[in-house]
Amino acid sequence: GMPDTLDYYKSNTDGMMFAKYQYVLKSYEDDDNKLITTENKDAEKFDMTSLVKKSDVLDEEISVYGIADNSNYVKIKKLSSLKKNEVYISTSFADKYGLTVGDTVSLDEKYENKSYKFKVAGFYDKSQSLALFMSIDNYGKVFELKENEFSGFLSDSKITDIDEDNIATTITIHDITKMADQLDHSMGSYMTYFQVLCIL
């Protein structure tokens, strides 16, 4: 049932978060067109987007990440040596769609008529979500990013030297646990109500 799922989320928050803080920037440049940087030693650039895996039954969102070489947060040794369209996928993604190494997986843009083909080079078992990982350089090539463009930072400590105005969202482990707690709370009372209804 639902509360079990929430317990699962709570115990797997680190499986949904690669670092204690995830900062997504509004843009990689500030208002003066200067590249946004941080002095924080924990901070690591990353890219992310969401693509859709289409099937007859439903279109499912897949998180796509560009990960820094020798990342401290997503430890996939071979990532930087992969070819442009080669990727690692989360084991949950592989299991759900029966994908194995060497398979080609096709994903689409949600709102544009654009499709990408990726070749599965390996699996990453530390992520609970349906996700796909590539090196940050390959991500830039695949999605045709501008030279210094990136999505944000992963960090295990709070980043204090980036102007709030430049940050689109900050996600912390605390947020995810809190979200699960709130859901648990609202679902909990809803479930009791539902059980009473069933008895009537």
Predicted regions and their residues:
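Basic-flanked hydrophobic alpha-helices used for secretion and membrane insertion
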Residues: D4-F194
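Selective detector of the "anchor" transmembrane alpha-helix that sits immediately C-terminal
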Residues: F194-L200
